[in-house]
Amino acid sequence: MEYLKLCFYLFFFYFVMEQIQQQQQQQQQQQQQQQQQQQQQQQQQQQQLQQQQQQQQQQQQQQQQQQQQQQQNPKMNNQPNETRLPSPPLLNSTVPKNELNINHHHQHNYKINSAPLKASQHANEYDHNEESLNSSNNNNNNNFNNSRPTFSSCSGNSNNTTTTTTTTTTTNPINGSVNSNVTTTSINTIHQKFITQLKQRLGKGIDYNNYINKLKNINNINNISKLINLSSQPDAIGKNNNLISNTGPVAEMYDDEEFDEFDEEEDDDISAQKLVGILSRESSSSNLSSIAPSPLLQQPNCLPSPFINGTPLLSNHSNNNNNNNNNHHHHHHHHHQKRLSIGSMDSTNHLTPLPLLHKHTNNNNNINNNNNHNHNNILGSPNQLNRSQDFTSKNNNINNNNNNNNKIINEENCNKGSPNQNSSENNSEEENEYHGGEEGNVYSVYDLNSPYFNERKQRALSNNKSQQPPQHVPTPCTYNDCCICAYGPPPSFFTSAPTWADICYIALYCLTLSRPEVKYYHIKKDICTFIDCHYETICMRKRTSIWRQTVNMTLSHPQYFEMFQQESALENGRKGYYGLKQIHDPYEHTALNKRSRRKRRHEQKMIQEELKKNGFTNLLLNSPSIENNDQHHNGYIQSYNNNSNHNNNNNNNNNNNNNNSNNNNNNNNNNSNNNNNNNINNNNINNNNNNNILTSPIQHHPHSHQQQHHQQQLQHQQHQQQQLLHQQHQQLLHQQHQQQLQIQYQQQQTHNNNLNQTQQLYYNHHHHQQQQQQQQQQQQHNNNNNNNNSNHNSVLTSPPLSQFPKTPLQLSQTPQHSLSALSSPFLKTLTIEDEDDSYNGQVHKKLRSAKLTSVNSINSNSGMSLPMISSPSPNLSHMQKNRPNFDDILNSSLSSSNTTNSATTSSSNSILSNSLSNISNSSGGSGGVCISEDYESNIQRRKSLNNIVLNKTNKNILPKLDDECDDEDDFHFTENEREVPVSNLKSSSFIINKNNIINQQNYNENNNNNNNNNNNNYNINNINNNNNNNFDDADDENEFENKDNINNNNNNNNNNNNNNNNNKNDKNESEFESKEKLNSPFGSSIPNIVNNEQLSPYSQQSLSSSSSENPSPQWSTNGPSQTSSSKLSNSTSTLINNNNNSMSIMSINSSGNSINNTTTYNNNNNFINNNSNNNNNMEIDDDDEDGIDGIEGEDDSKKRMRKTTRPDEKIYLEIYYQHFYENNGKHSKDELITLSNNLNWKVNRIQRWLDNRRTKDKLKNLRVSQERTISFGASSTSSTQTSTNSPSSQLSPLVPNMNNNDQQSISTPSLILSQINNNQNNNQNNNNNNNTNNADVTLISNNNVPNTPIMANTQSNINSLLN
């Protein structure tokens, strides 16, 4: 085997080595091939180089031949009777591109078709040396693109370095015949520089014989003048590339179409213009006295110029062209002091001197291109030359030349009153600015000649351009249901500048309403397009170039993950799609209100001061009322019907329209106040709309008729869309309003039947007193309108689309009367129960009478509940959170209410510690019914029901922002506007001895404003009477309880807001049902009624704490009384005085699952104590937030939103908890997934709720075990004590009652169990363990036997379970 292995290894090694060798060979072959290819490429390159060298040699030979020919041509054409004029460049020959110093994109071939030239030519003019040919000049590009040739230089002013004696032959300018034979000398030395520049311009390989041959075709001076005239027209480049046609003058050969095709950047022609321009520049730069031998007669001391009919062809002025490298040609022309005097020809062919017609300068400021020229040529056309006629030219330089000076001022003919005299046409937009914006306003010669004129003009033009913003025409909105187009931006956008998060949210909100079938929207196609359409409306800032990047960064920023949700690219394969996690109405909600903390606190102080001055006047009642008319439907002000889009600056008209619609229902003295407030509201709306129009990017130019027409069409379309949306909105509102009325009527039908009798009795008793109070309240209301309305009329908008008012629970009828909104576009309806239909004239009075200044100030015709607001708003929170205590209200009304209670109150020693409700209609002390308290409790019940419906509707709410958490701390108000309350649980039924029933509803609201009154906690043991002489230690007990309660109340101030939100909205309602009804006419539906034969003068009832919003009903009997206005717990003690002269107190918790303590009283009425446990913060009815992490620290900048559990959700969770998680704490995966899908909860949230629920069960079991040990310990120590009324002395053990339907009957007349609440002082940071307490049981005997309290202080650390 080893041998086989060795053979295998050798074979494998050999195989591998062969593979390696093959690879190496292949690599070598490839390298060889590459080397061969490289060698071939090198050979090819060498061949190419050789060919190029040969070509260069051939070109050099050709150039030498051409030079030789050029040297021979002047000698061959040397004739004494002919003169040679400087000719234009090659017109029919092509010029190679590589031989020109100027880069040309195109080459044009020009033809000259005319008669042959008969003028004499001199051979000695163009004799050149080779040295002059090879000489180079550095000014290759400086003097190339001038505008016009001017042969003007006087010999008297010229300083020539070389002087030559020239004799020219005079020829007839018309016939071209030679007049005399004149011998000329060579002028080659004068023209050497000119010829060298000419060759450098036109190329070295040009045959100059062609020039001479071409010039032979020009027959006379007229054609020469035509050629020169064409050179002054830079636009004379036609479609056919012909300079001179066979027939007709030159000015008639070029149409306007040919001028329009003039290209400034591709002016690559080699025409007569360039040649003559070179000649003119050469003459001016080198100061030559003569350019070429002229066929004309030479005037003394002047350069001869060609003439046609006695008119000079060329004007007399010099061009000092300073061409910079940047192509900025600033030509400052200085006139010669001496003019050229040239006149018409006489009979002897001599000219008489005449002055020039015009004196003008060339102001050429060519900024961008070299093709911008001034058309200052005197000649209008060769055949039409008049002294009084200006030239005709056309300029098509629109964008490249800002200085097209076409208006030239003549010395002899300068009429400012005739603007049409100069027929120049300028297509540039700056022409009007250049001429001062008015026709005929031209500048003087001195301004044109000023060296600073062009700079000033350029500066003015640049300033005008910088001041004009770029015209951005927004795209019209294409969405049918657009909230922004219909209603404008939300109200919070006007209180503070909106952030980009707010802008993105409102954009996604409107997109969601317009396209509800789509969940995610693309950032560029949808979101940015929507923002672009409404940028000036919602952004309220300047449009920048990077605002789209800002939107992208905002949507993807981690700070706004709870607002915006990005679609997963893994699921659908798409990127850049965003949506909203939770949708709320930004026209109602306060989340977008980002005012500073200082401003909000200042507003709070102002509101509190007004409330103190006005005596708790409801802010809604002071707002102007509006009657039903055509412009209003269900209390909504349609402010967008004022056509503010069409009125740019007409705010007064809009105000008048709104005032007419808003002031129809103003009664008494409120008309002036309402008018002022409506003006404020309407001005705010209309100013915003007008700003949107004035800041629109469309610039209204007086001549832009198309833009104005387009804008008017857009406005008309928007107006039509708004009308259609308004009609649809009204129809939907009407339908929904009817549906809500039907539903609410069915829900409240039974409840109304129970309240009718109470309302009627209350009306009969307080009708007279209410009429007196109404007159006083009307005066207060009129005096306070200005103060209240000034803070709440700043924002008034119309309702958003597809969002309707969440009306509160109404009783019977909901009138279409409405109140002006505080900060939302909705005007909330008032829940009024009217008996008659005519309420137009009575509503205002009813609103005034519905103030809460006293318990008795209720509407005379019907039971009225407070107007409830359906949506959270900043001003609403101010209103609700700053209500004064109910105790303060009652204290202020005691003076007026004591007059009616004098007949019923028999005891003058009654002590009212804080506040007591009124006692009325109780005669003789027997069968007394507290009517005022009864009716008050009914009102509070209705208010709580309204709060339930109110808070259930506010489900989809934006998460908390940074500043929202400060509102709750500032107002010290525990009701959270984001909470969704849980409906009432099943009430527990207990049998309490015989014929004694109390149907009590506890409104245990926590009020931080009552902390000063907490020292007088439910300590009703401080009753000193003659019957208490047997209890020596009673006072000591009371002192001990007072100390504990004071400590507890002082220590609970830190955690009032976070811990006590559990006790609200009827979650902790305890109702007692009985087998027999009361004998009173109200039946068992009236709460807080005790029907006894005789009430003990010392009997007390443990009352619920009164809150700022829902004051609980409180009542007392004839004896001395003391109320508890402190912060009590959910469990309450019910006091019942039986016929058998024995009393029992049963304490139950809010859920009804267990009985905490039982207290029984004997018939001696010696000692009374209440049982009020403050340890129900751990009950099941609390929200589903986890116990520790649910409420974060106050220092946390980002507090989590409180999540609450609805009743239907709690049912699912309880079922799952009882079946799976209660015993072993384990889950069922399938059931857990099903539960998560049904509730739309995440698994982590369900886990937190279950853990919190299990922790509460542990705490409850521990509490029950402690109470059990305390109760048995008390019974064992008091086993020898018996009662005279009961044979049994055993106490039944307290077992937790987990079933709500179970009934227990407990009767222990032999013992008196009095519980003393010893609340532990918990100053820990744990917010959920604030009010835990341990029960202290005191056994009190009957008759005269003194007893000592048995204190069982079990210091069990319950906090360890939560930690």
Swiss-Prot record:
User: Where is composition skewed (Acidic residues) in this entry?
Assistant: 1179-1195
Q: Where is the composition biased (Basic and acidic residues)?
A: 1064-1078
Report a single Gene Ontology molecular function: histone acetyltransferase activity
Swiss-Prot/TrEMBL keywords:
Coiled coil, Developmental protein, DNA-binding, Homeobox, Nucleus
Localization of this protein: Nucleus
Q: Which domain of life is it from?
A: Eukaryota
Residue numbers spanned by region Disordered: 66-96, 120-177, 308-437, 621-731, 765-818, 857-911, 1001-1137, 1166-1202, 1270-1341
Record has Nucleus as a keyword: yes
Question: Which cellular component terms (GO) are annotated to the entry?
Answer: nucleus
Q: Which residues bind DNA?
A: 1198-1261
**Which cysteines link up through disulfide bonds?**
none
Polar residues: which segments have biased composition? 73-96, 148-158, 379-393, 794-818, 857-883, 1081-1095, 1297-1316
Functional summary from the UniProt entry: Putative transcription factor.
Q: What is this protein called?
A: Homeobox protein 13
Q: By which gene is this protein encoded?
A: hbx13
